[in-house]
Amino acid sequence: MHYPSKNKVRMLLVAASMFLLAAGGLQNANADVKQENAVNAERVQKGKVLFSENCQVCHQEGGAGKPGVAPSLTNKELLSAASDRFLLDTIRDGRPDTAMPTFGQLLKDEEIQAIVSYLRSFGTEPVKGGMLDNDRKAMGDPRLGARWFSQVCAGCHGVNGEGYEGSGSGTAIGKSGFLGKASDGFIRYIIKNGRSNTPMRGFAGPTGMANLNEQEIDDIITYLRVLQK
């Protein structure tokens, strides 16, 4: 009878040990994923309850929004373009001079994060917020931007971007509460793509409402920054 050499036995034992270690590592990884998913699901459910208690009265069930009252918070464009920081800071600080109050003294940080996790659960596209926040600064002519804003934006957002206070159906994009948190990349993305489930439609390309080109969009953003100042 032929017996395997000591080296072969040693190699077989090493291979078996490596297999058992890999299997154990895979089991641990699967357990970690399951635990993380459970934590995330719990956070989303907590956020849903907090949203119902604090946000739903204006933003409606499921964050669908209502024109003239509060914008949709669960449309795919916003959830793709907005960074977590944008959402967290907006909930915490509110939007001064609008109906959006500050929740920073009412809710704990982890509760605000839970609301953001709940909103994120509606997302259907990759989150580009971080990339957009690092996008180039708008370099435009505010005088031309004022003209474009008057022609294509003021009808909904108000003459000076005052939003609902100007009896418009759009939000107050000319006030510091928005402009202080929104990057040029974020604004550019929303102008191009619009926000579904709201009156805001995309303005770029041949199918856009105004077919604005890159420079014209930058002109509008530059004008908004003048309003911010």
Residue ranges and their predicted role:
Residues 37, 41, 48, 60, ...:
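Gly/Gly-Pro-rich "capping" loops immediately C-terminal to redox-active cysteine motifs
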Residues 42, 46, 86, 110, ...:
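Extracytoplasmic/secreted proteins, especially bacterial periplasmic and envelope-associated proteins
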Residues 56, 78, 96, 121-124, ...:
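Residue-level marker of structural boundaries
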